[in-house]
Amino acid sequence: MNSLFASTARGLEELLKTELENLGAVECQVVQGGVHFKGDTRLVYQSLMWSRLASRIMLPLGECKVYSDLDLYLGVQAINWTEMFNPGATFAVHFSGLNDTIRNSQYGAMKVKDAIVDAFTRKNLPRPNVDRDAPDIRVNVWLHKETASIALDLSGDGLHLRGYRDRAGIAPIKETLAAAIVMRSGWQPGTPLLDPMCGSGTLLIEAAMLATDRAPGLHRGRWGFSGWAQHDEAIWQEVKAEAQTRARKGLAEYSSHFYGSDSDARVIQRARTNARLAGIGELITFEVKDVAQLTNPLPKGPYGTVLSNPPYGERLDSEPALIALHSLLGRIMKNQFGGWNLSLFSASPDLLSCLQLRADKQYKAKNGPLDCVQKNYHVAESTPDSKPAMVAEDYANRLRKNLKKFEKWARQEGIECYRLYDADLPEYNVAVDRYADWVVVQEYAPPKTIDAHKARQRLFDIIAATISVLGIAPNKLVLKTRERQKGKNQYQKLGEKGEFLEVTEYNAHLLVNLTDYLDTGLFLDHRIARRMLGQMSKGKDFLNLFSYTGSATVHAGLGGARSTTTVDMSRTYLEWAERNLRLNGLTGRAHRLIQADCLAWLREANEQFDLIFIDPPTFSNSKRMEDAFDVQRDHLALMKDLKRLLRAGGTIMFSNNKRGFRMDLDGLAKLGLKAQEITQKTLSQDFARNRQIHNCWLITAA
């Protein structure tokens, strides 16, 4: 009897144990990452040929304590290697693990290689050559703390390499994991199986091989036992012949069918090739088709199973499309696949909840470093009384109501950018802004007292409902998460896409960037204030401080300002402002752009202006600014500096976002200034619910 070890992906150990026992293995013992078992020589070959779940089959040779590199050398050399190798066989060493002595795996592998070579030369036998790429024998050494475990890898290449997939092709899941997913899906061979996001077809091919009794090792060309001295070619040929006979019989007798589709024509072509090389191409129909076009291939029965490994995203900007995809799949399953089973394997359990289906079973597994879950569902047959479940119904109804109200209003106003929803319902704490045919959903980060999983699920529901109600393509929705700011955090960079969208606001053409920054380049709540500046600017010299992207300057220029001066500390935003001005034909010496710390520039400037717009941050302690700034504390000092630049009869429009801001009217009077609050006049319909989003004042000489 041989003592053997079969390795597998984490989470599949019990499944592998059952498989090995069915092959005839005895004394099976599950450990993390694999199964120890025993069997005769025939079982060695059968486990290699027939295991769909094992990553590798190892023949343990011994262990040794490693307190020095000499211990490792002597421990390896103690094994009778001349009885392991055939004469002339090549070998390679795979070494993993480190300890205080062996701190480099390459060094560990070199010591093992030296010990093996010296074992031959000391017996005056030809030394075996190393072949790292295609060795006849693979020696595996795993060092854990002070113990090194030494084994022969009888598999050669990993057993997931069945021989039907082009090695150049990238597969999101290995074939061994795919086989486990099929086994856990609840699908019964002899019933239809469909994968609507099949990629290169791995799940369907593994299922078809299982259903037709085709051994996973049947198409492999190389094995790790070819140079093993104890290899029995006669028994191996018997095992191989039996597998070929069973495969022919299984294919001839199988009557059901498999269906695969994917939106990528290139991977569908690869899937067809893979299925043909696996010997089951005639059983699978592959189509180039988007999930949105998915239909039941057997509407009159029989019932089957939909099985897939849908995409998941690591970046926030990929989530809206994935949420829409899962929501759509859930609706299609309910509408067209009543009576079928559904099984999905995913690295994002939250996305699976977008299906709006209740799972009957779930399993955990590792896909490389990723923690994954597989959930199985039964889709109930629809009845005349069945009503489709609404996702975030209260939110969807409010958004629909707001859309009806604001869409017509915005069209009449001549604006393309407006707020559709502003945390109207406390449990759906987001802002939804429309920018032409794009939508930005901003989630206000939930408090720590809210369960993170529930908050994420609610956000997914919001996105699915937003896409559905507004009828937009998922790739036209941008998702952002923001903390509630004490001031504008306009300089936070989120990305590097550099994609700008041209929008109209009254008679102005403006550029927005929906993805690269926390803000978009256009503060929607200041829309009316900008229009007022345009109406006030004819024939005047206009100054815009803390100008951001210069949208207020554009309105002033279009309103007939004699000159405009735009000041901001950020070169990025000044260049953006220049593009906005150029877009509206506002070029030349009359339109200056100045990069400077606005507070320092204000103290040193000696020019005169008729109309000044200033929208400072609530608070700033930027390293690039000379002093910390607090708008409540420092607004009088600011007004003192502004007054010096204000021409007789001129006006300052002063705005800020400080909640509860109190204007020091007495202090203003001492400066010879008076203030008129115009906040309510500057709040448009879409911001009527949020009356503290900004405050705005007109300041003139008393």
From Swiss-Prot:
Every copy of the THUMP domain together lies at: 43-154
| Reaction it catalyzes | guanosine(2445) in 23S rRNA + S-adenosyl-L-methionine = N(2)-methylguanosine(2445) in 23S rRNA + S-adenosyl-L-homocysteine + H(+); guanosine(2069) in 23S rRNA + S-adenosyl-L-methionine = N(2)-methylguanosine(2069) in 23S rRNA + S-adenosyl-L-homocysteine + H(+)
Molecular functions per Gene Ontology:
23S rRNA (guanine(2445)-N(2))-methyltransferase activity; RNA binding; rRNA (guanine-N7-)-methyltransferase activity
CDD domains named in the record: AdoMet_MTases, THUMP_AdoMetMT
Q: What is its main location?
A: cytoplasm
Q: List the disulfide bonds.
A: none
Compartments, as annotated in UniProt: Cytoplasm
Output the superkingdom of the source species: Bacteria
Q: What is its EC number?
A: 2.1.1.173, 2.1.1.264
Sorted alphabetically, which keywords does the UniProt record give? Answer: Cytoplasm, Methyltransferase, RNA-binding, rRNA processing, S-adenosyl-L-methionine, Transferase
List cellular component terms (GO).
cytoplasm
Spell out the family assignment given in the record's similarity comment.
Belongs to the methyltransferase superfamily. RlmKL family.
NCBIfam families assigned to the protein according to its UniProt record, in alphabetical order:
PRK11783.1
What is this protein for, i.e. what is its function? Answer: Specifically methylates the guanine in position 2445 (m2G2445) and the guanine in position 2069 (m7G2069) of 23S rRNA.
| Protein name per the record | Ribosomal RNA large subunit methyltransferase K/L
